[in-house]
């Protein structure tokens, strides 16, 4: 008698995706982040569902409803901080996952990579709208500043902004629609994750060497299930540590003040995971130019497969490209730091230099370095 997991219409799909899936034997810890992102998404949907049971999306009561969750709901403080810090964990895993793809050349699976970029945009949109919901000072002013950027679009910009706001300023209509979209988007993300996996399983996983591994495959279960569970434990320990010991470490103190349209905070800034893009936006004095640079800072990922000039897929055996990759990481960390600083000397020039380097490394230096390595290896 054949095993039910191999014959049942539903179970055999799960079996071929998570149990009997042939996987390269050399996958390192950098391949753990896909499953960690799945756990993050599950945690966010669950905690978000419980928060939505108590939250009210009205400008008069939104801030108080969040306070009520933290003070009066059983373990409401725990659910709220798991959700807030869970978002930070989500982005840490997301950026490491994308970084892994860049380093090991996973972007050559173009369908998987492109769905991944759409996923990144969807998660960023979800996080932005979620940050508006507590209706604190930074929520309100963050929403005002970021949505107002769309007014830089020629001809339709102003109408578009008013359409998104549902009026002439960020108000009740804006908060209500942001809550509706913030609730809906994670389920769209979950559907896109299935598409992402579907495309990945068409080709099979990449591996650290970038060399086809068809001759050396092992079953996903038990080898990588055990490895993934270890990853879950480490991440959930870090999440619990932050939630229980320093829940406000990654937040902004201004968000403990109710939204007030007549008082502008001294430094308007988004959550830490958007600071690199915010720094690129601020480094260009022109509004439309800044918006284009902001969008391109993420959309540039779609161009990377076309700029792959190396004869090797992975950077594992390419020391010059490795140096450039880590320089790019240093530039991104610098941008993240600059995004949280006030707009004054010397932060302005540092931000502009780092922004220029970011695009220069990806668009010019990496392809040239790859060609140089080909030449040095006489390929």
UniProtKB/Swiss-Prot annotation:
GO function term, MF aspect, one: metal ion binding
Which positions, given as ranges, span the membrane?
Answer: 33-53, 77-98, 113-133, 178-198, 226-246, 288-308, 320-340, 347-367
Q: Which Gene3D superfamilies match?
A: Cytochrome Bc1 Complex, Chain C
InterPro entries tied to this protein: Cyt_b/b6_C (IPR005798), Cyt_b/b6_C_sf (IPR036150), Cyt_b/b6_N (IPR005797), Cytb/b6-like_sf (IPR027387), Cytochrome_b (IPR030689), Cytochrome_b_C_euk/bac (IPR048260), Cytochrome_b_N_euk/bac (IPR048259), Di-haem_cyt_TM (IPR016174)
Ligand binding (heme b b562): 83, 182
Binding residue positions for a ubiquinone: 201
GO cellular component, as recorded: mitochondrial inner membrane; respiratory chain complex III
> Which of this chain's residues are annotated to bind heme b b566?
97, 196
| Cofactor binding annotation | Binds 2 heme b groups non-covalently.
Q: Which PROSITE patterns match?
A: CYTB_CTER, CYTB_NTER
* UniProt subcellular location: Mitochondrion inner membrane
Q: How is the protein disposed in the membrane?
A: Multi-pass membrane protein
Q: Which Pfam families match?
A: Cytochrom_B_C, Cytochrome_B
A single GO BP: mitochondrial electron transport, ubiquinol to cytochrome c
Which coenzymes or cofactors are required? Answer: heme b
Instruction: Write out the entry's keywords from A to Z.
Output: Electron transport, Heme, Iron, Membrane, Metal-binding, Mitochondrion, Mitochondrion inner membrane, Respiratory chain, Transmembrane, Transmembrane helix, Transport, Ubiquinone
The task this protein performs is described as: Component of the ubiquinol-cytochrome c reductase complex (complex III or cytochrome b-c1 complex) that is part of the mitochondrial respiratory chain. The b-c1 complex mediates electron transfer from ubiquinol to cytochrome c. Contributes to the generation of a proton gradient across the mitochondrial membrane that is then used for ATP synthesis.
Protein family (similarity comment):
Belongs to the cytochrome b family.
What other comment is given for this protein? Answer: Heme 1 (or BL or b562) is low-potential and absorbs at about 562 nm, and heme 2 (or BH or b566) is high-potential and absorbs at about 566 nm.
Q: How does it assemble?
A: The cytochrome bc1 complex contains 11 subunits: 3 respiratory subunits (MT-CYB, CYC1 and UQCRFS1), 2 core proteins (UQCRC1 and UQCRC2) and 6 low-molecular weight proteins (UQCRH/QCR6, UQCRB/QCR7, UQCRQ/QCR8, UQCR10/QCR9, UQCR11/QCR10 and a cleavage product of UQCRFS1). This cytochrome bc1 complex then forms a dimer.
User: What is the protein's name according to its record?
Assistant: Cytochrome b
Q: Which organism is it from?
A: Rhinophylla pumilio
Lineage per the UniProt record: Eukaryota, Metazoa, Chordata, Craniata, Vertebrata
């Amino acid at each position: 008698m054949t095993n039910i997991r191999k014959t049942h219409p539903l179970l055999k799909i799960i079996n071929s995706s998570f149990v009997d899936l042939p996987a390269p034997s050399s996958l390192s810890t950098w391949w753990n982040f896909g499953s960690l992102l799945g756990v993050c998404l599950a945690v966010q949907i669950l905690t978000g569902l419980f928060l939505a049971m108590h939250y009210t999306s009205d400008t008069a009561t939104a801030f108080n409803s969040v306070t009520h969750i933290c003070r009066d709901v059983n373990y409401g403080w725990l659910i709220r901080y798991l959700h807030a810090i869970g978002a930070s964990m989500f982005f840490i895993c997301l950026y490491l996952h994308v970084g892994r793809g860049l380093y090991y050349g996973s972007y050559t699976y173009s369908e998987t990579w492109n769905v991944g970029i759409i996923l990144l945009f969807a998660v960023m949109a979800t996080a932005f709208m979620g940050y508006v919901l507590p209706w604190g000072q930074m929520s309100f002013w963050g929403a005002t500043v970021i949505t107002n950027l769309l007014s830089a679009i020629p001809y339709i910009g102003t109408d578009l902004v008013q359409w998104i706001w549902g009026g002439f300023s960020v108000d009740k209509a804006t908060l209500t629609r942001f809550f509706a979209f913030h609730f809906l988007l994670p389920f769209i993300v979950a559907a896109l994750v299935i598409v992402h996996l579907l495309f990945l399983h068409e080709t099979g996983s990449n591996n650290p060497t970038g060399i086809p591994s068809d001759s050396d495959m092992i079953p996903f279960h038990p080898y990588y299930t055990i490895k993934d569970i270890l990853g879950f434990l480490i991440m959930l320990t870090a999440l619990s540590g932050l939630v229980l010991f320093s829940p406000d470490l990654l937040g902004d103190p201004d968000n403990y003040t109710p939204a007030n349209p007549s008082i502008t905070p001294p430094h308007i800034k988004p959550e830490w995971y958007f600071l690199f893009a915010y720094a690129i936006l601020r480094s260009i004095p022109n509004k439309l130019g800044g918006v284009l640079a902001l969008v391109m800072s993420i959309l540039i990922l779609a161009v990377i497969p076309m700029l792959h000039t190396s004869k090797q897929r992975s950077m594992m055996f390419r020391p010059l490209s490795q140096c450039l990759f880590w320089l790019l990481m240093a530039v991104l960390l610098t941008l993240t730091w600059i995004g949280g600083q006030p707009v004054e000397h010397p932060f302005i020039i540092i931000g502009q230099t780092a922004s220029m380097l970011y695009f220069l490394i990806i668009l010019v230096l990496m392809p040239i370095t790859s060609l140089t390595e080909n030449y040095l290896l006489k390929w």
